[in-house]
Regions:
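Acidic, metal-coordinating catalytic segment for phosphate/diphosphate chemistry
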Residues: 1-19
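Active-site-adjacent beta-strand/loop module that shapes the phosphate/pyrophosphate-binding cleft
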Residues: 80-109
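Conserved Nudix-box catalytic region and its N-terminal flanking loop in Nudix hydrolases
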Residues: 23-65
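Conserved hydrophobic "DFG−1" position in protein kinase catalytic cores
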Residues: 22-23, 30, 100-102, 122
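A short coil-to-beta-strand element that immediately follows conserved catalytic motifs
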Residues: 70-79
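Nudix hydrolase/Nudix homology domain
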Residues: 107-148
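A generic structural micro-feature
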Residues: 12-14, 41, 88-94, 112-117
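A structural signal for short, well-ordered beta-strand segments
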Residues: 20, 76, 98-100
């Protein structure tokens, strides 16, 4: 979009986001959304990257805020062009999915979910519910494909 008065060009670039697939002995953590968009659906800990953050820094912050867990990134699962929300108000995003593990002491980590979520559960890949967002569904498909 170009400003008709000054000629400045505004580019509709996607916002960078991150999602964490926290692996605990083959089960992965999902959070039930407690706010819109897609309230009541399952999704992964994650969110928007803040200015000056790297992807691993952003996912560590988001996981700590949403679950109280300290994590470390194991690998990148994939990078997906997607949207946050539905319909005309959907925001284009560039979503990086990380496979992570708990780094708190013995790895058990005590969950302390934020008000953003109403529930947290660990699911094996075979029983994992349909994630709320397209990028999460793509990451789940890749995890299932490469898990054996």
């Amino acid at each position: 979009m170009t400003c008709p008065k000054c000629g400045w060009v505004h580019y509709e670039n996607p916002a960078p986001t991150v999602q964490a697939w926290i692996d605990r002995d083959g089960s992965f953590l999902a959070l039930r959304r407690n706010e819109q968009p897609l309230k009541g659906q399952w999704n992964m800990p994650g969110g928007f990257v803040e200015a000056g953050e790297s992807g691993p820094e952003a996912i560590a912050r988001e996981v700590r805020e949403e679950t109280g867990l300290a994590i470390e990134v194991v690998e990148v699962i994939g990078i997906f062009a997607s949207t946050y929300g539905d319909g005309d108000d959907a925001l284009p995003i560039f979503d990086v999915a990380y496979r992570c593990r708990i780094s708190d002491g013995d790895g058990s980590g005590a969950l302390e979910i934020s008000a953003e979520s109403s529930e947290a559960r660990w699911f094996p890949l075979a029983e994992f519910p349909r994630p709320a967002f397209a990028g999460e569904r793509q990451a789940l498909a890749l995890l299932r494909e490469f898990s054996g």
